[in-house]
Amino acid sequence: MVVGVTMINVVPGEERSVYNELMKMGEIKDVFHVFGEYDFVVVMEVEGLSTLNKLVDQIREINGVTATKTIVGAEL
C-alpha cells in the first residue's frame, strides 16, 4: 500500500463543491478543510504509485481546484 497526502488550493467559494467531489472518490481516506496556505488536505491509500498518480490527476480535474501538492509516505 502507498499512502499519499495531497494539499489542495481551490477557487474561493468552491470549497463545498470540491469537498463533495472528493468524498465520492473511493481511495480517499480523509479530507480536512484547513486554513492557511492550502484549502484542503487529503489522505489517500492506494495499491501503488501509478494508482496514486491517476488519483491525483482526477483531483486536479475537479472544477474549482487550482493547484495541488502531493507527498508520498514511506515506511520506516
Regions found by a protein language model. Give the residues of each.
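A compositional/biophysical signature of low hydrophobicity enriched in polar/charged and small residues
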Residues: 1-76
